[in-house]
Regions:
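C-terminal motif of bacterial Sec signal peptides marking the signal peptidase cleavage site
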Residues: 15-16
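Short solvent-exposed beta->alpha transition segments
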Residues: 32-35, 49, 68-146
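Exposed beta-sheet edge and beta->alpha loop/turn motif
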Residues: 114-197
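Sec-dependent signal peptide recognition
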Residues: 2-8
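Short, low-complexity N-terminal intrinsically disordered segments enriched in polar/charged residues
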Residues: 20-57, 61, 69, 79
Length: 197
């Protein structure tokens, strides 16, 4: 009898203690185009939304060959506000006139993905319903990466998308507050600059 009680108790704890993340329903393209938010969005907003979603999908699937285009490689390091202790990145940028090279991004994608906080940006875009992105110019989400919590906001105006990332965990292992700005070139979002706050 005790065995059954402990089994039930363990199962009960397992279900109650697991994270209850709200599931964001992904709409098909057809469903999305039928929403009020999509119908009421301006053509410019639809274009910016489309580029933002393409960026997120490439980040999610880790399309290493496409990411240098988004980062506008070769990109000057001061425009990225990049002061890294990572020797692979530092050696590469010093050898490339202090620019982040295309080869570095493709050859060391996971390193760049985490070092440049693309993981936080990816999770932020993913966690916001598409209809909210279409209906609002400024949206926000809380993102957890490992043991670190971040409050992220996405501001979409004209042809610009800004990501404002604020650390909610007072821990030296967590990323510092920063702001990213991407500008649409009519086809994709291209990094304008990144600024540590």
């Amino acid at each position: 009898m005790k065995h059954y009680f402990y089994s039930f108790f363990t199962l009960f704890l397992l279900f109650n203690c697991s994270e209850n993340k709200p599931e964001i329903k992904k709409l098909t393209q057809q469903e999305l185009t039928e929403t009020t938010e999509f119908k009421e969005a301006s053509p410019e907003k639809k274009q910016l939304f489309s580029e933002l979603k393409a960026f997120q999908k490439d980040l999610q699937s880790k399309q290493a060959q496409k990411i240098p285009d988004y980062l506008d490689c070769p990109k000057r390091i001061e425009e990225l506000d990049l002061n890294t202790k990572n020797t692979a990145i530092r050696t590469d940028v010093e050898a490339n006139s202090f620019r982040l090279s295309t080869n570095l991004v493709t050859d060391n994608f996971d390193l760049i993905y985490n070092e440049l906080d693309l993981n936080i940006i990816n999770e932020a875009i993913k966690s916001i319903p598409e209809t909210d992105l279409l209906a609002n110019d400024n949206v926000s989400a809380n993102v957890k990466i490992g043991e670190c919590d971040y409050h992220t906001s996405i501001l979409m105006k004209n042809k610009e998308v800004e990501f404002d990332i604020k650390s909610a965990t007072p821990n030296s292992e967590c990323k510092k507050d920063q702001k990213w700005k991407f500008v649409s070139n009519g086809e994709i979002l291209v990094l304008d600059h990144r600024k540590m706050l």
